[in-house]
Amino acid sequence: MIALGCDHGGYELKQEIKKYLDEKGIEYKDYGCDSLDSVDYPIYAKKVAHAILDGECEKGILICGTGIGISITANKFKGIRAAVCTDCFTAEATRLHNDANILSLIHISEPTRPY
């Protein structure tokens, strides 16, 4: 099972990923967030990291505006190896060579929005 988590910046992409996983018959558990309302990404990085470490899920996908903050937070947990990937090559390489267990994705719904 795949653990999914995001902040408000990643919510829309997470919804698309859920549709894709449903179509492919891949099981997942959504750990939030559940809307576009502003939230703090560390909450969801922690939930997904714990789901993997506790054995509820095998792998995870985390999404925030840059993918960086949420992956840094997840990597604070011993046994978690989160990697920001921007294409299929880096995703496959980090899985094969670094044994990454969380894929961290970028999603900026408003590219001109200041951080």
Predicted regions and their residues:
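Short, structured active-site "lid" loops
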Residues: 44-62, 66
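Single conserved hydrophobic/aromatic residue that forms the stacking wall/gate
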Residues: 106-115
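Short beta-strand segments
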Residues: 5, 62-67, 85-86, 104-106
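Compact, glycine-rich, soluble single-domain proteins
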Residues: 63-81
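Short, acidic/small-residue loops that bind anionic groups at enzyme active sites
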Residues: 77-104
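A short beta-strand-loop structural module common to alpha/beta enzyme folds
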Residues: 27-38
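N-terminal beta1-alpha1 ligand-phosphate binding loop
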Residues: 1-17
